[in-house]
């Protein structure tokens, strides 16, 4: 079986418009790697997703989101669990627009020059959450390297508005790395710390140049460690994808690094390429291997480990948090 190769060179076959939202090939045309696809691996039988159904809340949720001009990472990143989650009335809200300043070649979120922040978004988000009567919400964002605080102030405004309208709702935030602005961002977040702090490492450090250009493995670890030092009572969380070319030992080492940086909760799921323009799947991890990861996670001291092919960082996030010991109601 042939193996896909990643060649570091500029791609210039797709016209680039910095003002437009770039997806797939257009988004990846200007990163210094070119993905050479080998033989496409056949999806194994354990990869199964549930499509949205008109008999569920799937379309109701989509309509409410459009009405309030909100985005979800479920839609923007083409999450395979969108049918199940929307059908159960849950979603991961994506704030600060739908154009990311990064071009990670595993991710399906669009790239481009971001729009100005919507000053009404925090209140619109809070009203939507109140209307849906959600008890647990996940708030994430695109990377906003154009903002002096990396968008941390906008996160705080969203948290404060949600708590004003839905004081019993628990809030998990899935943040970018606030590159070069982490100390400032953490200081700003003191005004309204979340109930769970999540930032994904995504993959092993060896693969960062290909998978997370512009990011730094140690920087991401330190972000969560610094937050934990400031808020020891707030659980910290991170996630990893498998299938990008890493080894099992590399995954276990990432897990050890997480625990060494006081990360409490862990998610591990199978990477699925959003398109042929994205990084290819280099292996499908067997359920037995996922079980091994889970067992090792608890041996290392994680309070909760959600591990499986279809697990994503915010998939069943409420169940993950409560299984880890998060008590009902905001943590303050």
Swiss-Prot record:
It is an enzyme of class 2 (transferase). This is Lipoyl synthase. Keywords: 4Fe-4S, Cytoplasm, Iron, Iron-sulfur, Metal-binding, S-adenosyl-L-methionine, Transferase. [4Fe-4S] cluster 2 binds at residues 100, 104, 107. The gene is lipA. PANTHER family: LIPOYL SYNTHASE, LIPOYL SYNTHASE, MITOCHONDRIAL. GO terms for molecular function: 4 iron, 4 sulfur cluster binding; lipoate synthase activity; metal ion binding. Its EC number is 2.8.1.8. Residues 85-303 form the Radical SAM core domain. Its main location: cytoplasm. It comes from the Bacteria. Pathway: Protein modification; protein lipoylation via endogenous pathway; protein N(6)-(lipoyl)lysine from octanoyl-[acyl-carrier-protein]: step 2/2. Belongs to the radical SAM superfamily. Lipoyl synthase family. [4Fe-4S] cluster 1 binds at residues 74, 79, 85, 314. SMART domains: Elp3. GO terms for cellular component: cytoplasm. It catalyses: [[Fe-S] cluster scaffold protein carrying a second [4Fe-4S](2+) cluster] + N(6)-octanoyl-L-lysyl-[protein] + 2 oxidized [2Fe-2S]-[ferredoxin] + 2 S-adenosyl-L-methionine + 4 H(+) = [[Fe-S] cluster scaffold protein] + N(6)-[(R)-dihydrolipoyl]-L-lysyl-[protein] + 4 Fe(3+) + 2 hydrogen sulfide + 2 5'-deoxyadenosine + 2 L-methionine + 2 reduced [2Fe-2S]-[ferredoxin]. Its cofactor is [4Fe-4S] cluster. The keyword Glycosyltransferase does not apply. It is found in: Cytoplasm. The keyword DNA-binding does not apply. Binds 2 [4Fe-4S] clusters per subunit. One cluster is coordinated with 3 cysteines and an exchangeable S-adenosyl-L-methionine.
